[in-house]
Curated annotation (Swiss-Prot):
Mn(2+) 1 binds at H7, H9, E64, D248. The lineage of its organism: Bacteria, Pseudomonadati, Pseudomonadota, Betaproteobacteria, Neisseriales. SUPFAM superfamilies: PHP domain-like. Keywords: Hydrolase, Manganese, Metal-binding, Nucleotide-binding. PANTHER family: EXONUCLEASE, POLYMERASE_HISTIDINOL PHOSPHATASE N-TERMINAL DOMAIN-CONTAINING PROTEIN. CDD domains: PHP_HisPPase_AMP. Pfam families: PHP. This is 3',5'-nucleoside bisphosphate phosphatase. Mn(2+) 2 binds at D14, H39, H250.
């Protein structure tokens, strides 16, 4: 299977590269199809699509929606969306409006733990205050020398129970899937191997996702081991879900796979991009 990367990020959300830069970086691997999926926003899609067209690379409009499901935060990728669809645009805006207040609370929590200046420091890494995230705090903490690398900063400060973690109510699973499908796209559970869930809880998530109208699961992910990939291929097959593939690239040197670099899906999988042919933006001949 040719490289197909349907999950990566730009500076429009919490990536380190502009939409053009991240497409140019992916182009070095001669991908067959790309989709930019910034968190809770679609502002980088036009630039990314234009960059892909210049490079002769087929492109899908995408987004990654933050969801609260029970006590868990999960992410739902939307592929082949119309970013101008009013319900999707309004829903994403409602999510973004809560990010800045959460960031202020994170900064105050870190200051109470003895690390001052984190909110202002994180803002310097963020082009759009509406999109400030844990990743921007993490980059500040690494850059300031407080922590040696991104993996350590999340483990030490930015996960549940740690000083810089602030819980937040994101979109419901039903709303997120509804916005995506209503905008002409297909909804995909992103990087399921990252969630702190056992088999029973993952099964429940999949069933709730399908009941909401979800259609796919990210089998090949920069967050997944080969064992994870084969496990979620079996989940996809058992539940009749399409399989997707994405690097979840954010920045050079921050771990995981580089943009445009994905594993082949196991043979039992039904690739989701075959169902999205009509939504693919293809370079002019």
């Amino acid at each position: 299977m040719a490289n197909i990367d349907l999950h990566f990020h730009s500076r429009t959300s919490d990536g380190a590269l502009t939409p053009t830069e991240v497409i140019d970086r992916a182009a070095a691997r001669a991908p067959a199809l790309l989709a930019l999926t910034d968190h809770d926003c679609t502002g980088g899609l036009a630039e990314a699509a234009a960059a892909a067209a210049r490079r002769g690379i087929p492109f899908l409009n995408g987004v990654e929606v933050s969801v609260s499901w029970g006590r868990h935060t999960v992410h739902i990728v939307g592929l082949g969306i119309d970013p101008a669809e009013p319900a999707l645009a309004a829903g994403l805006k409602s999510i973004r409006e809560g990010r800045l207040e959460r960031a202020r609370q994170m900064g105050a929590s870190l200051e109470a733990a003895g690390i001052a200046g984190c909110f202002d420091g994180a803002m310097r890494w963020c082009d759009n205050p509406e999109m400030i995230s844990r990743t921007h705090f993490a980059r500040h903490l690494v850059d300031s020398g407080a922590v040696k690398d991104m993996r350590t900063v999340f483990r030490k400060y930015l996960t549940p129970g740690k000083p810089g973690y602030v819980s937040h109510q994101w979109a419901s699973l039903e709303d997120a899937v509804g916005w995506i499908v209503g905008a002409g796209g297909m909804a995909v559970i992103a990087h399921p191997g990252r969630y702190d869930m056992g088999r029973t809880l993952i099964e429940r998530l999949i069933l709730d996702f399908q009941a909401a109208g979800g259609q796919g699961i990210e089998v090949a992910s920069g967050s997944h081991s080969l064992d994870d990939m084969h496990k979620f291929a079996l989940h996809a097959d058992r539940h009749g879900l399409y399989a997707s593939s994405g690097s979840d690239f954010h920045a050079p040197g921050e771990g995981g796979r580089d943009v445009g670099h994905t594993e082949d899906l196991p043979p039992i999988c039904r690739p989701i991009w075959r169902e999205l042919e009509a939504r693919i933006l293809r370079p002019a001949d």
